[in-house]
Regions:
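C-terminal catalytic domains of large/alpha subunits in multi-subunit enzymes
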Residues: 1-230
Length: 230
């Protein structure tokens, strides 16, 4: 392999030999981030030179008899600047979203009299590879002049939107908004039954917020889909 630069090319071995001092590779590069320190008068600061952005969506199946939520498909799109290592990017996104799905659907520390009753991996439900849906990591391949080599972070940001994406998908599938995590079967089933009981008692007239849901569902097969997708 040869490294090509502005003044020519050299083999990787030649470059390593030139950069080594006493057998230690010493070629380094520093990137000075454009940040703003804390202003004691305003309390404002900018501790990052570049900010990443992400959006996620999932497709779910909700069993109305058991309350079990199954994620069928997942996509995670990121503005992480220049992706220097595509394989590392994809692995990071898949791993981060797997953690997010675990937090959204099952991970929870349970306590009894102030003591955790599921403190080990024997009884703490982490998702396994076989539990995961297809996860599609995508990058918009932007470039940020403030990031090293135009790159931006793709770390914790993967985990942040996952639970919201799952909760939104469940709400879209059932019409019931659940605002507490994780979305365990008992919690989902309880919310569905409570919603059914309220619907029988009050109907649409007693819950105006559901008029638009019922209207969209009735109009969609009657041509609304074509209007929205023009």
């Amino acid at each position: 392999h040869r490294v090509i630069g502005a003044t020519g090319s050299r083999s990787f071995a030649e470059l390593a030999t030139q950069g080594g001092v006493d057998g230690v590779l010493t070629i380094t590069k520093e990137v000075e981030l454009d940040i703003e320190p804390l202003d004691p008068m305003t309390g404002l600061a900018n501790f990052s030179g570049a900010y990443s952005f992400a959006v996620q969506a999932v497709e779910v199946d909700v069993d109305s008899d058991t309350g079990k939520v199954t994620v069928l498909d997942a996509i995670s799109v990121h503005d992480s600047g220049v992706v220097v290592n595509p394989i590392g990017f994809e692995s990071q996104v898949i791993g981060g979203m797997a953690m997010g799905l675990g937090a959204a659907l099952g991970e929870e520390l349970l306590y009894e009299q102030g003591r955790p009753i599921n403190p080990s991996y024997l009884n703490y439900p982490l998702p396994r590879a076989a539990d995961l849906p297809p996860i599609r990591p995508l990058s918009v391949q932007g470039e940020d002049p403030h990031g090293p080599y135009g790159a931006k972070a793709v770390g914790e940001i993967v985990l942040i939107p996952t639970a919201a994406a799952v909760a939104n998908a469940v709400a879209h599938a059932t019409g019931v908004r659940i605002r507490e995590l994780p979305l365990t079967p008992d919690r989902v089933l309880g919310a569905l039954r409570q919603d059914q009981a309220q619907s029988r008692s009050y109907g649409l007239a007693g819950r105006p917020s559901r008029w638009w849901i019922a209207g969209i569902r009735s109009l969609y097969p009657r041509g609304l889909q074509k209007v929205l997708h023009r």
